[in-house]
Curated annotation (Swiss-Prot):
Basic and acidic residues bias (residue ranges): 641-653
Catalytic reaction equation(s): a 1,2-diacyl-sn-glycero-3-phospho-(1D-myo-inositol-3-phosphate) + H2O = a 1,2-diacyl-sn-glycero-3-phospho-(1D-myo-inositol) + phosphate; 1D-myo-inositol 1,3-bisphosphate + H2O = 1D-myo-inositol 1-phosphate + phosphate
Keywords: Coiled coil, Cytoplasm, Hydrolase, Lipid metabolism, Membrane, Phosphoprotein
Protein source organism: Mus musculus (Mouse)
Record field: compositional bias (Polar residues): 566-596
Gene Ontology biological-process entries: phosphatidylinositol dephosphorylation
Signal peptide: none
Protein name: Phosphatidylinositol-3-phosphate phosphatase MTMR7
Length: 660
């Protein structure tokens, strides 16, 4: 709070950048974690909350006659324009937000003060939801070819790798350590994904320190061990995700790529994904296009093309597709690396795994995938997403691009993914929000030193608790798209890359449909489920009525037999055979007939009993058709749609028995 110069400013206006609506007048509050704007309108009192950690840039614009404008751009692509009456207040807010948006210590981040009112046990259980040891068991590991290695115990070989890693059984500790010394940042080849049916694998590492002629026997033996761990193939692919020109330039610095003359039985492949600096500039250009007010279609498309953003998305997808096809169609193992093995390598390994394994296309599996290929393998979350004050040149939208690749796949295969677009945008939001501890720091080692799991909460448990909000209504476990690998079309023209309006313009309400396709389909699905439940209830009721009618027929036949053979008289005081007793008030219906035994008395039901035994299904609904009505209906309650038999007398079937 010591960084807040002015905690409250009144008569601030919030400008709607898309529509021509009048700016909302309200009060601006600065807290230790949020910027809050509260409208003055008594009928709405709408609030706009912005986390300090979400703020990307703050721009103080030239003072106008109406006040001093302040433009806040957020990392989740929200843009807020405020007009503050006094220039001094605007300057105080500006200086305060500059400091609050760039904390210098992890303890200043929101996750260390966030308290969702869960006890210690619930917090611990939340961190146990995603268990990577269980994930490797699901892959069929360990087996005859791969083993769990403790060579990196206490992070003594590579401080950016996890402590538990799977390596080929034939790779000794000496080979692993020797290979690590020949790799940038000591990130030696380790297993990322394993296909237990074909024994093909995806491994990852950093670039070798080969320069123009250097070689390392242990590194060559390591790659040979990966090849031998797949008896179905006599070679492995080595995929360098960088443009070849960039990789060659690294050779001059003593790094580079594998020399095929030194490594036996490898096939080398360059992909051509640009570095973090190119990606950062590309995103900036695309966002400038998104900020244009009422651009023409040609201007928007030209700006989007000029940014190169979708070309970069395609390059990442191409790399993932190449690796997935090598594993699924050729049965070959693949080693993937870029420069340091924590940016482009994470992107393409996770895209390939997503294409290969339907488990990663489920809600739980996608969390496991991010935990495995991004969090545990040392993606630099702090540096790439600016959690703390640091070098702005290190910031780059690496995981944003991966999330967009997943969205592009959901558009191409709408029935293959259990989760919807909202799930992806919420993950992207929390990468930057620092509300949970999952995406803090640059490595597993740093997170353990900071005791993240003891001091913060897990995002995965929060998403899992609210998983009903993230379900894809088109997903079916028995659909062909959910079985095995996703096979993308070979012709480039058959795969369409789209601008993701739901991500980059999701806060511009004027550019969004009134109801998303996902919400509409979920409403239709709920309506269908409700109708199915009503149908099932009607069928059960019909079956019950038929049973009652059958028992009534038996009772009638038993009553007629004694009257024929026993010679019972029909005196005036015989209540059982008096017609008016059957047609009168149902409450006066005798509970037992003199002509019946005890065992038959239970078969005689009153109208009240019949009515109370089943719900009234003839209640008509005055709902109008439409999505809004569909979305508010619930199978467990609320109004019901009129059924076909709603106009009939609901007691007509019972009356047949009562007249008998």
């Amino acid at each position: 709070m010591e960084h807040i110069r002015t905690p409250k400013v009144e008569n601030v206006r919030l400008v709607d950048r898309v529509s021509c609506k009048k700016a909302a007048l309200g009060t601006l509050y600065l807290t230790a974690t949020h910027v809050i704007f509260v409208e003055n309108a008594p009928d709405t009192r709408k609030e706009t909350w912005i986390l300090h950690s979400q703020i990307s840039t703050i721009e103080k614009q030239a003072t106008t006659a109406t006040g001093c404008p302040l433009l806040i751009r957020c990392k989740n692509f929200q843009i807020v324009q405020l007009v503050i009456p006094q220039e001094r207040d605007c300057h105080d807010v500006y200086i305060s937000l500059i400091r609050l948006a760039r904390p210098v210590k992890y303890e200043e981040l929101y996750c260390f003060s966030f308290n969702p009112k869960l006890d210690k046990e619930e917090r611990e259980q939340g961190w146990l939801l995603v268990d990577l040891s269980e994930e490797y068991k699901r892959m069929g590991l360990p087996d005859n070819y791969w083993q769990l290695s403790d060579v990196n115990r206490d992070y003594r070989v590579c401080d950016s790798y996890p402590t538990e890693l799977y390596v080929p059984r034939s790779a000794t500790a000496h080979i692993i350590v020797g290979s690590s010394k020949f790799r940038s940042r000591r990130r030696f080849p380790a297993l990322s994904y394993y296909c237990k049916d074909s024994h093909a694998s995806i491994c990852r590492s950093s670039q070798p320190l080969s320069g123009f002629s250097a070689r390392c026997l242990e590194d060559e033996q390591m790659l040979q061990a990966i090849r031998k761990a797949n008896p179905g193939s006599d070679f492995i692919y080595v995929v360098d995700t960088r443009p070849k020109l960039n990789a060659m330039a690294n050779r001059a610095a003593g790094k580079g790529y594998e020399n095929e003359d030194n490594y036996s039985n490898i096939k080398f492949q360059f992909i051509g994904i640009e570095n973090i600096h190119v990606m950062r500039n590309s995103l900036q250009k695309m966002l400038e296009v998104c900020e244009l007010k009422s651009p023409s279609m040609s201007d928007f498309l030209w700006g989007l093309e000029n940014s190169g953003w979708l070309r970069h998305i395609k390059a990442i997808m191409d790399a993932g597709i190449f690796i997935a096809k090598a594993v699924s169609e050729e049965g070959a193992s693949v080693l993937v690396h870029c420069s340091d093995g924590w940016d482009r390598t994470a992107q393409v390994c996770s895209v390939a795994s997503l294409l290969l394994d339907p488990y990663y296309r489920t809600l739980k599996g996608f969390m496991v995938l991010i935990e495995k290929d991004w969090i545990s393998f040392g993606h630099k979350f702090n540096h790439r997403y600016g959690n703390l004050d640091g070098d702005p040149k290190e910031i780059s939208p690496v995981i944003d691009q991966f999330i967009e690749c997943v969205w592009q796949l959901t558009e191409q295969f709408p029935c293959a993914f259990e989760f919807n677009e909202r799930f992806l945008t919420h993950i992207q939001h929390h990468v930057y929000s620092c509300q949970f501890g999952n995406f803090l720091c640059n490595s597993q080692k740093e997170r353990r030193e900071l005791k993240i799991q003891e001091r913060t909460y897990s995002l995965w448990s929060n998403l899992w608790k609210n998983r009903a909000d993230y379900l894809n209504p088109l997903f079916r476990a028995d659909h062909s798209q959910t079985q095995g690998s996703l096979h993308l079309p070979t012709a480039p023209c058959n795969f369409t890359y789209k601008f993701w309006n739901g991500m980059y313009n999701r806060f511009e309400k004027g550019l969004q449909p009134r109801q998303s396709v996902t919400d509409y389909l979920m409403a239709v699905k709920e309506e269908s489920q409700q109708l199915e439940e009503e149908l099932e209830s009607l069928e059960e009721r019909l079956e019950k009525i038929q049973k009652v009618h059958l028992h009534g027929t038996k009772v009638k036949s038993k009553q007629s037999e004694p009257s024929k053979h026993s010679g019972f008289s029909t005196s005036d005081h015989s209540t059982a055979n008096t017609p008016q007793d059957y047609s009168g008030n149902s409450k006066s219906f005798p509970s037992r007939s003199p002509s019946q035994g005890d065992e038959d008395s239970a078969l005689i039901l009153t109208q009240d009993n019949l009515k109370s035994s089943d719900p009234d299904l003839s209640v008509n609904s005055d709902q109008e058709s439409g999505v809004e009505d569909l979305s508010c209906r619930s199978p467990s309650g609320g109004e019901h749609a009129p059924s076909e038999d709603s106009g009939k007398d609901r007691d007509s079937d019972e009356a047949v028995f009562l007249t008998a």
